[in-house]
């Protein structure tokens, strides 16, 4: 399972166990696999995941400004929340706070699809439901400026 490093930073020791909540509300145990503070990407291995669906990856290199996208997440603990918008810009440099310091995340996708605290690590998908990015940062205090890590960088 892909997520953001900042989402699992407290469990970033190899073999650490966490609980993940799926869209249907069920909970599964997962094990920390790896994460990278510089790209804000984390990987978990969900136990007994054979029956879980797998998202298809889209090609973020094929995105165009104005293209419709959908962000999925759990803002404020409200699970399986979906918001829609467009790709506002491509190749935006993203800076995200990481453990008291800052790390640069280059080539982000800017979207006006609402991404709020709790959406981090959730997917940004195209109209066909293909994964094109991972919700990562909000450019505060500016409203409606949301940044996503592309699937292909």
Identify the meaning behind each predicted range.
Residues 148-153:
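A short, hydrophobic C-terminal helix/tail in secreted or cell-surface proteins
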């Amino acid at each position: 399972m892909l997520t953001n490093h900042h989402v699992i930073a407290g469990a970033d020791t190899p073999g650490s166990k966490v609980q993940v909540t799926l869209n249907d509300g069920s909970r599964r145990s997962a094990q920390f696999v790896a994460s990278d503070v510089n790209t804000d990407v984390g990987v978990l291995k969900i136990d007994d995941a054979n029956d879980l669906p797998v998202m298809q990856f889209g090609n973020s290199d094929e995105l165009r400004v104005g293209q419709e996208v959908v962000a999925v997440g759990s803002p404020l603990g409200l699970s399986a929340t979906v918001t829609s918008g467009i790709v506002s810009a491509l190749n935006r440099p993203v800076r995200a706070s990481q453990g008291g310091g800052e790390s640069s995340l280059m080539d982000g996708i800017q979207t006006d699809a609402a991404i709020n605290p709790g959406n981090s690590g959730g997917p940004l998908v195209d109209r066909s439901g293909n994964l094109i990015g991972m919700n990562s940062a909000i450019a505060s205090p500016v409203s409606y400026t949301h940044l996503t890590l592309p699937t292909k960088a």
